[in-house]
Amino acid sequence: MVVFQTLNGNDQPQTVSVEYQNEDWELPPVTSNPPPLPFPEDEQEAKKVTDANDLYDVSLASPVRCDLPLLQGGKVADEELSKHLQNYIGCLTRVWGPALQQAGYKAYQPKITVFPEGETVTTGCGTSKSQNAFYCGADQQLYIAQDILDVLSPDVDQARSVFDLIIAHEYGHAIQGRSGILGGKHVLESDLSKSEALELNRRNETQADCFAGAAMSSLWKGLNLTDQDREDIIKTTFEIGDDQLAERHNLPDTTGDHGTGANRRLWLERGLGAQTLGSCNTYTAPSGEVE
């Protein structure tokens, strides 16, 4: 429990206590060698882990401590960003680790690599260009280049929450990996048409948006997030929708693989208000909610 003082309406000190959760849970060290990911043996098992995962019955603890000041917005030195995000990943692990274990899965703390803008990074999944942030299932690590801000709207690229939101989304993919959802997706998509595979991928991405919202909700008090942060988080998620990116960067009007701005925002907000992770079950949602 943390006790601190605030001011009431009469500008008088008022003691407020916060009973943080998961305080006794032992945070695993950062690792570049996590346990292997679970992988379903057939389509029946794959459907079970995507559509009816044991994780969906679990609630994330809240509030969870995160003694970490947010960045002030915009680009910072790569070393500063790397230190901030690795500490933030520790907070996310304190949120997600007990939930994974409750559902019967193994928790770990992934490593973040911040690579220079304009350059490439070599990962277990191959080589990737900058203006990107991603989770690599082959090495179970997270990667980000600061010039990912260049693809965002000027309305949100200076928000102090932007890097934390992006990493919460990518950490959501790490949770999908550890819970077998990613493995299930890979099994299921092998026999799908192109349009069906795109929809399956959008289900996966919007679930990561929802997981990001749920985790940030758990960390809300610990990070001292505000109503303005909430507005920025919601707007940023909308701005990275397939349709919004296409319009802003004059890209061809094609079917996207991440979801429209409206649907990405929908699932983020569901995560922010989730009582259980079943609220993030995009795999059984109507197609219209994952367009």
Q: Residues of each region from the PLM?
A:
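N-terminal low-structure segments adjacent to metalloprotease catalytic domains
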Residues: 1-60
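Acidic helix-start/capping segments at beta-turn-to-alpha-helix junctions
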Residues: 73-81, 85-91, 101-124, 232
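Active-site recognition of the HExxH zinc-binding catalytic motif
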Residues: 96, 161-181, 208-209, 213
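Catalytic zinc-binding patch centered on the HExxH motif and its immediate surroundings
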Residues: 117-145
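Short pre-active-site segment immediately N-terminal to the catalytic Zn-binding motif
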Residues: 148-166, 196-200
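Post-HEXXH active-site segment of zinc metalloproteases
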Residues: 179-202
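Post-HExxH zinc-binding segment in Zn-dependent metallohydrolases
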Residues: 194-220
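Pan-zinc metallopeptidase signature
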Residues: 244-291
